[in-house]
Amino acid sequence: MASRTKGTTTIEVGADGVAVITLINPPVNSLSFDVLYSLKSNYEEALSRNDVKAIVVTGAKGKFSGGFDISGFGEIQKGTMKEPKVGYISIDILTDLLEAAKKPSVAAIDGLALGGGLELSMACHARISAPGAQLGLPELQLGVIPGFGGTQRLPRLVGLTKALEMILTSKPVKAEEGHSLGLIDAVVPPAELLNAARRWALDIAERRKPWVSSVLKTDKLPPLGEAREILKFAKDQTRRQAPNMKHPLMCLEAVEVGIVSGSRAGLEKEAQVGSEVINLDTTKGLIHVFFSQRGTTKVPGVTDRGLVPRKINKVAIIGGGLMGSGIATALILSNYSVILKEVNEKFLEAGIGRVKANLQSRVKKGKMSKEKFEKTMSLLKGSLDYESFRDVDMVIEAVIENISLKQQIFADLEKYCPQHCILASNTSTIDLNKIGERTKSQDRIIGAHFFSPAHVMPLLEIVRTNHTSAQVIVDLLDVGKKIRKTPVVVGNCTGFAVNRMFFPYTQAAMFLVEHGTDPYLIDKAVSKFGMPMGPFRLCDLVGFGVAIATATQFIENFPERTYKSMIIPLMQEDKRAGEATRKGFYLYDDRRKAKPDPEIKNYIDKARSVSGAKPDPKLEKLSEKEIIEMTFFPVVNEACRVFAEGIAVKAADLDIAGIFGMGFPPYRGGIMFWADSIGSKYIYSKLEEWSKAYGEFFKPCAFLAERGSKGAPLSAPLEQSRSRL
């Protein structure tokens, strides 16, 4: 977790009698405790000086503030920093000092005012913004609540319904919308921002403009009965959408107290709740994810060598299927010029059609204008040969999983592409060293493993071979960030990080079913745990062909610890293939709505007769907690192997990979963080117990056995670096 950020504020008093207080804490002027204490000191100075008539608060270098520096929460959780007394910042500083001051203050907002930054601006008596500035309260997605008065001031400025929408979704609005809502008093060009704010502040001081304390406003609040109905609806919706998280409901309680009992009581409730949520397990998990996600681009021995990413102007994609067209979509959406290559006109037309459909979907949803659609599509060109590859900076191969085909493609690429060109493969199953065997360019061969649909899913696994150069990794990390993916650098192995970690997930579920557990109870328990869907619903979604192909590679590579179930092959024999055929583990209606299928029992019985498995009375009566343990502890076990083998540099990278690649619930912090919250000793003892009862599939690996026997954290760094990176 990041160390405590130092920051400050400056004060400058002009001849006009306006004190300009500037927030300084690069890169986004986050409100660390240092900044807040400095703000208080400079405010007190401005209020005590006779030559100051009014105050303007602004941020350095074109950004107002990105919000509270949440590394402070981490320090408080670890006990390395003392928490200020409850309400000190929100009540003592922002309300009783700043908002209640005898001199008016105006916030001059440029770039962004998020979280505590927006809350600080709402405590000012007016807000002037440059066009396009982002305004929002994203705290809930970090596991905390708006704790600097946001639960009280935002409803009073924009109305209760809009305030709840902004708080619960964490979605910002732009300055122009903020102006129409009443959150912003005026939008002015950036060059005029500071002078406009100074004039506005003086106009308030001289009573030419209204002196508004937003915490006292009531004109935007609905009648009490209506407000209670709105809040009840919001609470019901929150319980449905976030059943495992307490902090959104706690936030709504603070809003409600302010509506019912007045803003002062609301501020006190907000301060109390804000102090309590810091120690929730879900908050610890979400804050861990926040920092871990930002840490994936720091790769020891790669990103600490002073290498600068080279400019990638033109990218070629080989293969216009679902994956290739999705990758092309992601690239052109970020203004990369893309060549899409196919083997014939029919396939090329289909590939370009898929890209077009992906963009048209955005137009229909109002996320893209027709003009932007045309401009974006103009970045895509089709090709049937390699002639147009002579000036590309990167190629991403996305053809079928056929090793000889891929080897031929990479041998051809070496002939046509310039020497600096990065040669990437989107393979999910084939050893990258084998793909590059026929080339002399193994230092520029790298895995760029996207997840389907590639233009939507946020993870990019960057797979390094023993030969890949650090420069190529740095380049691909930069591309990943520019196309708005979370890139994670991993080593070359079967399944890489995500598929390797999670292959025991479905196999454990199959094992349980063959030994007596109801598949629909497993799916229900796993969904309640927080996964997007259970393992059987997931098999239906991806299709049985993909499920069998994926399982086969692990059975071939790790025969000693795989569970080979015949349930899916037997279903395939009867032309069941999952959701695509409307029959899999579930039956699907015209709207693709799933319902349990009583016929599944027949396939389970047949599979038992093949494997020799028999229902186990213990496994027939598993609780939801036991289902989760027997499904996910094997995943923890495999994650430990991946970490111990050096496939990942940090355990936190595996947390991020599981969250963004498999949908592991972020509020649980990721697979390794979750495991440590349970305790390695307990996980080791359960796996040991099951391995004795049910076989090698559950046997704890040496790394887990070593740490579990001592009760040591699984995510602690390896004593000696065994990283393949």
Swiss-Prot record:
Alphabetical keyword list: Fatty acid metabolism, Glyoxysome, Isomerase, Lipid metabolism, Lyase, Multifunctional enzyme, NAD, Oxidoreductase, Peroxisome
Gene3D superfamilies: 1.10.1040.50, 2-enoyl-CoA Hydratase, Chain A, domain 1, NAD(P)-binding Rossmann-like Domain
InterPro entries, sorted: 3-OHacyl-CoA_DH_CS (IPR006180), 3-OHacyl-CoA_DH_NAD-bd (IPR006176), 3HC_DH_C (IPR006108), 6-PGluconate_DH-like_C_sf (IPR008927), ClpP/crotonase-like_dom_sf (IPR029045), Enoyl-CoA_hyd/isom_CS (IPR018376), Enoyl-CoA_hydra/iso (IPR001753), NAD(P)-bd_dom_sf (IPR036291)
Location of the active site: 119 (nucleophile), 139 (proton acceptor)
GO annotation (BP), single: fatty acid beta-oxidation
Native organism: Brassica napus (Rape)
Residue runs in coiled coils: none
Main subcellular location: other
Gene Ontology CC terms, in alphabetical order: glyoxysome
EC number: 4.2.1.17, 5.1.2.3, 5.3.3.8, 1.1.1.35
Protein name: Glyoxysomal fatty acid beta-oxidation multifunctional protein MFP-a
Pathway field: Lipid metabolism; fatty acid beta-oxidation
UniProt motif Microbody targeting signal: location: 723-725
